[in-house]
Swiss-Prot record:
GO terms for molecular function: pyridoxine 5'-phosphate synthase activity. The lineage of its organism: Bacteria, Pseudomonadati, Pseudomonadota, Gammaproteobacteria, Pseudomonadales. SUPFAM superfamilies: Pyridoxine 5'-phosphate synthase. The record marks 150 as: Transition state stabilizer. Keywords: Cytoplasm, Pyridoxine biosynthesis, Transferase. PANTHER family: PYRIDOXINE 5'-PHOSPHATE SYNTHASE (PTHR30456:SF0). HAMAP family: PdxJ. Signal peptide: none annotated. It comes from Pseudomonas entomophila (strain L48). This is Pyridoxine 5'-phosphate synthase.
Length: 240
């Protein structure tokens, strides 16, 4: 199973003071050295963390691949066509949210998402859709032509009781199986950390987990390379 390292919150720390440090590009290179299979960045409309310059630098220096998360806007479509990343993940986005709060409603806007997928696919990127583990959304993702999906694991991560955790984990398991059955590449992520990742990593059929905030937080105490290496080891062991 692959590990995609999201470096958004390295940039969050930088933007909090408007400084030049810490550098998310350095974090990305350290993550690659520690075993990351790819680097994920989300250029938000409000530019609260990652900036255009970060993305342009990463495109030039990454040894693995970039997974570019973006809202479905004309501004971001034009930017993605300019940088031509290896992977593009379409996500929902609102200015008020602290972080992405749910999956993209593909079923409710199929024509719009289909047009975006077709346009972005012409750049050569593998386009994925960040969605909830819901059969209706998974089927819609296939219909619009996306080759991949990323299942939102936030509800699992936020579950507090054993019953709720088990229920949300089953939702992910079922979603993965359904997605694979639809012929889709299935990734997953959001809210995963060192104490909840193993159950998700053990799910057969998941191609990649995208993890960020927990890695950045742990890196404050152990360093970024060690934080990434530790997460990678957990995922590899659980997915055997």
């Amino acid at each position: 199973m692959l590990l995609g390292v999201n470096i958004d919150h390295v940039a969050t720390l930088r933007q909090a003071r408007g400084t030049r440090y810490p550098d998310p590009v350095k974090a990305a290179l350290d993550a690659e050295e520690a075993g990351a299979d790819g680097i994920t960045v989300h250029l938000r409309e409000d530019r609260r963390h990652i900036q255009e310059r970060d993305v342009l630098l990463l495109k030039d220096v990454l040894q693995t691949r970039m997974n570019f998360e973006m809202g479905v806007t004309e501004e971001m479509m034009l930017f993605a066509e300019k940088i031509r990343p290896a992977h593009i993940c379409l996500v929902p986005e609102t200015r008020q949210e602290l972080t992405t709060e749910g999956g993209l409603d593909v079923a409710g806007q199929e024509a719009r998402i289909k047009a975006a997928v077709e346009r972005l696919s012409r750049t050569g990127a593998e386009v994925s859709l960040f969605i909830d583990a819901d059969e209706r959304q998974i089927e819609a993702s296939r219909r619009v032509g996306a080759p991949a999906i990323e299942l939102h694991t936030g509800r699992y991560a936020d579950a507090e009781t054993p019953t709720d955790v088990a229920e949300e984990l089953k939702r992910i398991v079922d979603g993965v199986a359904f997605g694979v059955g639809q012929g889709l590449i299935v990734n997953a992520g959001h809210g995963l950390h060192y104490h909840n990742v193993e159950a998700v990593a053990a799910i057969k059929g998941i191609n990649e987990l995208n993890i960020g905030h927990a890695l950045v937080a742990h890196a404050l105490f152990v360093g970024f390379k060690a934080a990434v290496a530790e997460m990678k080891a957990l995922i590899v062991a659980a997915s055997r």
